[in-house]
């Protein structure tokens, strides 16, 4: 199922974004240029995640237009993963903001 594939890719992008921002924070003082690169990579991964998330939303909306509401089980799973992904995305964005605010 394509939505499962997209959800897995969203998870990967979030994990990568988190890893990059944590590296950026870790190396900010000792290696500022490399830390900035890690920050930029974290931003890029979040951009990928947002594109994938939008695609999931588009697929659900297309399903609604063509055949009506998706099965309840599918929507329950989507809502669970959506909440999980948005929580992780918020935590990453907070860390990205902290990185930019640190002197």
Question: What positions do the PLM features span?
Answer:
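Non-heme di-metal
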Residues: 1-103
């Amino acid at each position: 199922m394509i939505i499962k594939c997209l959800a897995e890719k969203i998870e990967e992008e979030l994990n990568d974004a988190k890893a990059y921002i944590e590296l950026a924070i870790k190396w900010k003082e000792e290696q500022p240029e490399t830390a900035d690169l890690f920050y930029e990579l974290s931003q890029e991964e979040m951009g990928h995640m947002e594109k994938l998330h939008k695609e999931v939303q588009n697929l659900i909306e297309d399903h609604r237009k063509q055949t009506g509401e998706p099965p309840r089980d599918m929507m329950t799973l989507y809502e669970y993963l959506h909440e999980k992904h948005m929580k992780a995305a918020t935590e990453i964005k907070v860390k990205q903001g902290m990185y930019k605010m640190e002197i």
